[in-house]
């Protein structure tokens, strides 16, 4: 006689648990959009900290959420069967006042929303609008047009800027800290190109008119195929890109536009679900519809190159740098066949995965091990005594939310 109930009820392709999930800026917590409102969880240990339910004339659905660190402000966009807000409107929800303190309406649906203490960045299908973060938002610069498919990323970081002054040389060479708002987006005119803009470089004429301002941008030729994802490092110094092919991940320097790393995820075409930098900006996590999670190391020789590299003429498969570690994800626990996930870092040696439709949280830990080198494995250049450091990705825990 069966007396034990299963931990997870397998309901394939039922109603989605969440309509959207998003990590906050430091990845210490995440927000989830639902048909009834939104929820906020601490990443590790996993715990629900906020749960809001709307009941305004039966209109309660939230389709997108974006937190502002751990503050009381949360960006919301309507969604689901009965949207609480229009899909072409953003609402900045004040959780202390229990009301939306700011709302801005657009002519087309909102694809992405980024918040900082200085800016509100709204990404539409083919354009980006930037406003000041205030009770009465004002436009910072003219509308950025000709972007591709509502794809963009935005980070804020501190940087040094040389101050200029007519008084003396010492003052002219002095430096000051400024808050830079780095914006990256693919070109809608030239597939494969991305544009980088720093909002702190906005050139404003004497006339107080946002339409007269100018935002300088730099261009990086990243891929031959259309861009699928761009992800800026937390320090605003590098940008990771992938195309619709999903086989190569490229990392570029924002300052020079030069290629720093080219990583190979695999040979078969794949849909990249998400890419995420760790806090130090020296590791990049990539998860795809092949149900694999890859970790790439930046500026270190910990990634793997193929055993036959250097023995045969240049072949793209052999030349690529592979991940320092990877793992195959267990799809048996998912309650939806076609689910997508977001990845976030817990410190520098652990990660969390959020499965949107299934409402499942997973924690993976990077474990290092030392073992004898085998012929059928990849080589590590400069490994002493035929031994090399290897890393594994191990699932430590999971939970149905």
From Swiss-Prot:
Q: Which GO terms describe its cellular component?
A: cytoplasmic vesicle membrane; cytosol; endosome; fungal-type vacuole; phagophore assembly site membrane; vacuolar membrane
Q: Where in the cell is it found?
A: Vacuole membrane; Cytoplasmic vesicle membrane
Task: Give the membrane topology, semicolon-separated if more than one.
Answer: Peripheral membrane protein
The UniProt GO MF terms for this protein read: phosphatidylinositol-3,5-bisphosphate binding; phosphatidylinositol-3-phosphate binding; phosphatidylinositol-4-phosphate binding; phosphatidylinositol-5-phosphate binding; protein-macromolecule adaptor activity
Q: Please tell me where this protein is predominantly located.
A: membrane
Q: Which Gene3D superfamilies match?
A: YVTN repeat-like/Quinoprotein amine dehydrogenase (2.130.10.10)
Superkingdom of the organism of origin: Eukaryota
Record key words, sorted: Cytoplasmic vesicle, Membrane, Protein transport, Repeat, Transport, Vacuole, WD repeat
Record-level GO BP terms: autophagy of mitochondrion; glycophagy; nucleophagy; pexophagy; piecemeal microautophagy of the nucleus; protein localization to phagophore assembly site; protein transport
Q: Cite the repeat ranges for WD.
A: 222-262, 267-306
Which InterPro entries does this entry report, sorted A to Z?
A: PROPPIN, WD40/YVTN_repeat-like_dom_sf, WD40_repeat_dom_sf, WD40_rpt
Tell me the function of this protein: Involved in mitochondrial or peroxisomal functions and amino acid signaling pathways.
Assigned protein family: Belongs to the WD repeat PROPPIN family.
Q: What is known of its domains?
A: May contain a beta-propeller domain involved in specific binding to phosphatidylinositol 3,5-bisphosphate (PIP2), leading to the association of the protein to the membrane.
Q: What is this protein called?
A: SVP1-like protein 2
Task: State the organism of origin.
Answer: Eremothecium gossypii (strain ATCC 10895 / CBS 109.51 / FGSC 9923 / NRRL Y-1056) (Yeast)
Q: What is the lineage of its organism?
A: Eukaryota, Fungi, Dikarya, Ascomycota, Saccharomycotina
């Amino acid at each position: 006689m069966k007396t034990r109930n299963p931990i997870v009820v397998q309901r394939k392709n039922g109603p989605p648990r969440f309509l959207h999930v998003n990590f906050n800026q430091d990845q210490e917590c995440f927000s989830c959009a639902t048909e009834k409102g939104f929820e906020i969880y601490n990443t590790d240990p996993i715990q629900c900290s906020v749960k809001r339910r709307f009941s305004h004339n039966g209109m309660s659905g939230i389709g997108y959420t974006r937190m502002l660190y751990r503050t009381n402000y949360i960006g919301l966009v309507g969604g689901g069967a009965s949207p609480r807000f229009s899909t072409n409107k953003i609402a900045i929800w004040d959780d202390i006042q229990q009301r939306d303190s700011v709302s801005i309406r657009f002519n087309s649906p909102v694809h992405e929303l980024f918040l900082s203490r200085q800016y509100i960045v709204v990404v539409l299908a083919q354009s980006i609008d930037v406003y000041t973060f205030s009770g009465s938002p004002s436009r910072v610069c003219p509308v950025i047009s000709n972007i591709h498919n509502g794809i963009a990323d935005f980070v804020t970081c501190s940087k040094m800027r040389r101050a200029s002054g007519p008084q003396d040389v010492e003052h002219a060479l002095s430096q000051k800290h400024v808050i830079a708002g780095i914006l990256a987006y693919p070109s809608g005119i030239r597939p494969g190109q991305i544009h980088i803009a720093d909002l702190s470089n906005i050139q404003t004429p004497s006339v107080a008119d946002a339409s007269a301002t100018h935002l300088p941008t730099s261009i990086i030729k990243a891929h031959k195929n259309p861009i699928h994802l761009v992800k800026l490092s937390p320090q605003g110094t590098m940008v990771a890109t992938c195309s619709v092919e999903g086989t190569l991940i490229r990392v570029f320097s924002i300052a020079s536009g030069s290629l720093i790393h080219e990583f190979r995820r695999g040979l078969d075409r794949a849909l990249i679900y998400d890419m995420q930098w760790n806090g130090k900006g020296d590791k990049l996590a990539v998860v795809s519809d092949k149900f694999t999670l890859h970790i790439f190391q930046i500026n270190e020789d910990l990634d793997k190159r193929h055993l036959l590299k250097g023995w045969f003429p240049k072949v793209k498969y052999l030349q690529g740098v592979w991940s320092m570690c990877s793992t195959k994800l267990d799809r048996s626990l998912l309650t939806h066949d076609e689910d997508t996930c977001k990845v976030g870092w817990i410190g520098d040696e652990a990660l969390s995965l959020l499965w949107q439709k299934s409402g499942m949280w997973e924690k993976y830990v990077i474990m290092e091990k030392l073992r004898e080198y085998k012929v059928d494995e990849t080589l590590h250049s400069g490994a002493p005594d035929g031994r090399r450091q290897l890393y594994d990705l191990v699932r430590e825990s999971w939970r149905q939310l």
